[in-house]
Amino acid sequence: MKYVYYYDTVIDPRQDERWPDKNTQERFQEIVKGYHLDSTMFLAPTTIRKQIDLWPEGNRFVRLLERESGEKTFLRVYNDMYHHPFETEITAAFKRLVMELPKVGFLTGHGERDVKKIGDRDYNTFTWDKPFRNSLLNQGFDVEEVNLNSPIPKDINILVIAEMRSELLPTQKTNLDQYIARGGNLMILSEPKRKEYMDPLLAEFGVKLVPGQLVSISEDHAPDLVVVKPTKEGQELIYHFDQIAKLEYVVVNPGVSGLEFNPEKGYKAIPLFETDSLVWNEMQTTDFVDDTARLNPDLGEVQQRYNTTLALTRKVNGRTQKVMVFGDADCISNGELSSGHKGIRASNFTLIPGSFFWLSDEEVPIDVRRPTPPDDLVYLSEKEASTWTIILRWIIPALMIILALVIWLRRRGR
């Protein structure tokens, strides 16, 4: 692999703070001086730009993969503790060179979550954030924004509708219905306050938002912070969700609606995540800071287990159409993916590879699982383990020392 060293302008607040009055060339000289590097080994901005435009990559270190026929793709490094790509990212990059991979369209025009913005409620992190390992771009997907003013392009494999905040116009509804009728896969994410706009859409799939907002009483967290776990059916359907359960993680929903399903529309439903039995649909309280949520059955509040995520399927045009419905749109937002909740072992980011793996018919992200080796289990009781600890840590080393002394004494005697 050929490596080319260069320097160019980057977005780096630390450099701006350290050298506020210096330009790119002057900053470059300061850096090479500090690292004792030869400045002549680096191509200047004007030179590297003649070879390739790396501004869309943030002028970061990247690897360019290129075929003789001209196809190109980037293999990036990431802002995590491992930095370099794993087998999943490497394989996805090579597959991108030789085949068409799924394209995900994100609906716009009705106040949906924005894939370009980095605000807490938006979706840039898991879609277009190139330094984020688990973003769709790095896992083999293409991403683009879609509006319903014209028919949805035929190369869109998965359509994401994340919290519409206004109703569809008749022509827009027609274009969406055409996509659904042709068997396109969808991911639909709602919010408790968007029932007015989301229920008409969800009704086409036999799904309805439970009135109110789910709450659960906690000593440490707000009532509207609801923790859900994968169902047994969800673990069997998507292996990523099985990993959440095995590692005893959960998914956090900061404001979520329960989901009800009716099979009259021809879909089959599989519940993926559910609450515990102490959760209820709060109909009255909306201020969970200064007010207290209390169960009131007279208002239609019911304390029970609620499904918060559903997987729907039906046969269309000889293939299986897949629809995934969430009662919460914040669970995979920028803010939720970049924050934590003390005392809660959350794994919300696992929703991304798991959901899109299923929606892409298990094409990407790449499944790199391997059969478990047959000799990786040691059957020892706690008492036996303690015994072997003593043998390995003390008895065997002592025998080795005694043997060494015997050999030394015999040689000395000779």
Please name every model-derived segment:
Residues 67, 76-77, 108, 273-276, ...:
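Pocket-edge structural micro-motifs
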